[in-house]
UniProtKB/Swiss-Prot annotation:
Belongs to the tRNA nucleotidyltransferase/poly(A) polymerase family. Archaeal CCA-adding enzyme subfamily. Its EC number is 2.7.7.72. The lineage of its organism: Archaea, Methanobacteriati, Methanobacteriota, Methanomada group, Methanococci. This is CCA-adding enzyme. It comes from Methanocaldococcus jannaschii (strain ATCC 43067 / DSM 2661 / JAL-1 / JCM 10045 / NBRC 100440) (Methanococcus jannaschii). Keywords: ATP-binding, Magnesium, Metal-binding, Nucleotide-binding, Nucleotidyltransferase, RNA repair, RNA-binding, Transferase, tRNA processing. GO terms for biological process: RNA repair; tRNA 3'-terminal CCA addition.
């Protein structure tokens, strides 16, 4: 068996994940064609546009193979009202795509923008205000052109390839993406980390010294903001803090969960210890399959019809409901082995695995030593019939719930008042599904991916 060095592994990975020069040239030509069409529309209507800018990983040459999205930002003067920006922005975006015989729809971020397809390329045309470094943003997307301008002048070809390696590593681990479902690393965060540490391997090595609350302030910040005082920077109560060079009041790493922060540290260590190309090939998915191929406890799903709201709203509400239910489950002494939530277009799924589904109807309650008069009297008053063992008071009580299904039936029927019910994920609309076999569980997971 041939053992590859880290350098050989990374070279092989890069050959697999880096887009070809020909593909990048085709993308640039198509992006230029769309930008030319936008300027054509702007001139025809005398719209107050200051700049049209190609942004994102494709524009900065940090994209992975088969990731050829075209993100175009249309920059307005700050004197334009937000209503006018939205109206003109949508007119420009829809008309440009129509003239190129593409298809489109309207999506929403901090304000509406046009998402479409032109000759096989996914295209976003986003209106925003043109601002300078240090200026107050008007909408969240105003930062994006500055992100691009900050990075494009600092990322050379070598660093771009290092970013690609990091993205591929994170993608394989299931840690790439800052959406509410993934809670991982954004592409912009990847670029900043490589800029800060200089290479993929240096980043992995330095990550071994990270702890919760790790803070990164890029040296470039001091070049942009001459009078910045690090002691007066905004404080963040988050596991990983990377100050945005474009907006020092923003933590670029805020979407990253504590567990995913720790996963990155752990798997970075494993890769450095035992380098393998497998870390770049759906590693998390394979690991999950291994973990699933085991004996299981009792599993059930609470299946709730999904309201017509975006993931950014539905996932936090599912998590809030599951945490609230978990408190009730633990209070009733059932042991949770695993719990998670996910959603498709039609339903929200809250999943649990329990050590056992049924407990004895009788529970033993341990009280204080008999010598502690006041506590002993309170225990006696609460339980009535008590007995003494090893100088302590004990009592037998009847459990309110001896079967987990009975507890969930009361949740679905609305009989428990101490469940915090979010606006868009109501357990009273739910259906309890028991997963009795391993095959049934695997099929369910497949359907819900």
């Amino acid at each position: 068996m041939i053992v590859l060095t880290i350098e050989e592994i990374l070279k092989e990975v890069l050959n697999e994940i880096k887009p070809s020069k020909e593909d990048m040239e085709k993308l640039q030509l198509k992006a230029n064609e769309i930008i030319d069409k936008i300027w054509e529309i702007v001139r025809e209507n005398s719209y107050p546009i200051l700049e049209v800018l190609l942004v994102g990983s494709s524009a900065r040459n940090t994209n992975l193979k088969d990731d050829y999205d075209i993100d175009i930002f249309v920059l307005f003067d700050k004197s334009v009202s937000e209503d006018e920006l939205e109206e003109i922005g949508l007119k420009i975006g829809t008309e440009a795509i129509k003239r190129l015989n593409g298809s489109y729809n309207i999506n929403y971020a901090s304000h509406p923008y046009v998402n479409g397809e032109v000759d096989g390329y996914e295209v976003d045309i986003v209106p925003c205000y043109k601002i300078d470094f240090g200026e107050k943003i008007i909408s969240a997307v105003d930062r994006t052109p500055l992100h691009h301008k900050f990075l494009i002048s600092r990322l050379n070809e070598r660093l771009c390839d290092e970013v690609r390696l990091l993205k591929a590593f994170l993608k394989s681990l299931g840690l790439y993406g800052s959406d509410v479902k993934t809670k991982g690393f954004s592409g912009y965060l990847c670029e900043l980390l490589i800029l800060h540490y200089g290479s993929f391997i240096n980043l992995l090595k330095e990550a071994q010294n990270w702890r919760i609350g790790k803070k990164i302030i890029l040296k470039d910040i001091f070049e942009i903001y001459k009078d910045v005082d690090i002691n007066k920077l905004k404080k963040f109560d988050e596991p990983f803090i990377v100050y945005d060079p474009v907006d020092l009041n923003r933590n670029v790493a805020s979407p990253l969960s504590k567990d995913n922060f720790c996963r990155f540290i752990f798997y970075s260590r494993q890769f450095l210890k035992n380098p393998s190309i497998e870390f770049f090939k759906d590693y998390a998915k394979k690991l999950e399959e291994i973990l699933e191929n085991r004996e299981h406890g009792y599993r059930l799903i609470l299946k709730i019809p999904r309201e017509n709201v975006v993931d950014d709203i539905i996932y936090p509400q599912m998590e809030k409901l599951q945490k609230s239910i978990n408190k009730v489950i633990v209070k009733n002494e059932f042991v949770i082995l695993n719990s998670k939530c996910f959603a498709d277009d039609n339903y929200c799924y809250l999943y649990w695995e329990f050590l056992v589904y049924e407990l004895p109807k009788i529970a033993l309650r341990e009280g204080p030593p008999v010598f502690e008069k006041e506590r002993a009297e309170r225990f006696l008053k609460k339980y009535g019939k008590v007995f003494i063992r090893d100088c302590k008071l004990f009592a037998y009580t009847e459990r309110e719930y001896s079967h987990i299904i009975d507890l969930f039936k009361d949740i679905v029927n609305g009989n428990l008042q101490n469940i915090s019910i979010p606006k868009y994920v109501n357990p009273r609309n739910g259906k309890i599904i028991e997963l009795n076999s391993h095959g049934e569980h695997k099929q369910f997971n497949k359907e819900c991916q």
